[in-house]
Amino acid sequence: MSNIPQTLTIAGSDSGGGAGIQADLKTFQMQGVFGTSVITAVTAQNTLGVFDIHPIPLNTIQAQLEAVKNDFQITSAKIGMLGTADIIECVADFLKNRPFGTLVIDPVMIAKGGAPLLQQQAVSALIKHLLPLADVITPNIPEAEALTGIKISDTTSIQQTALDLQKQGAKNVIIKGGHSLNSQSQQCQDWILLQDGELFVLESPRFNTPHTHGTGCTFSACLTAELAKGAPLKSALQTAKDFITAAISHPLNIGHGHGPTNHWAYSRL
């Protein structure tokens, strides 16, 4: 049996290659783990927007999950775009017996250009069925607000939101600060609440760039890869923070809109 760490992404396909399973698999590769995938939706998108979303039939999603489970030793998995309540329930039912080790949930709700990627009625399904399975959840500020109903306006409300997500079942919570509380801030702060109650902040410089398509996918994929390699959570979080900071600060300038991050940048530092 190979000793190469094996990972799984359960997410949508991005025809533009900047987000979704494409971003996840690129990140897995760069971090030295073998990536498998379960496609939940096919999207027609590029740097300018999302033009079509086709959810994958439930039986095909189930078949993909079974195929990966029956042939690979997955030690860490991540969930990205699921899209519908039915898909959420299908995936959650399969994952309830923990076939893929540590589970990272990136609650993908809105594309970089503003297009909704999660149906409104699916939000309650995500809260009910997936949050209790999350070893780590990685919402940005708008996603955290949608999951809790709490308006984030300061550090106190961030802490309240993180605690609420834990009460809903997530063990460890990372609220990403790309959508800053202070638009003039030169720092990007991510707030982390660990299962043991420790609360701390990871900081990085903020870069004035439109090329941030797929940042959430890339961050959670790097975190998943590090956990698959056996890294402690705090170490894995720091690596993911460093990876996405490098990816954002060395843009590829591809496309005519919100371009992708640079998945090669971290390895070239």
Predicted segments, located by residue:
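Conserved N-terminal subdomain of the carbohydrate kinase-like
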Residues: 2-9, 26-112
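Short pre-catalytic strand/loop immediately N-terminal to key active-site residues, enriched for Gly-Thr
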Residues: 10-16, 199-213
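Glycine- and other small-residue-rich loops at beta-strand/loop junctions that grip anionic moieties
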Residues: 13, 79-80, 115, 212
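Phosphate-handling active-site elements
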Residues: 32-36, 198-200, 226-240
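Charged C-terminal helix
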Residues: 55, 234-269
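Conserved phosphate/ATP/ADP-binding segment of small-molecule kinases
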Residues: 120-199
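Short, small-residue alpha-helix embedded
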Residues: 145-146, 209-233
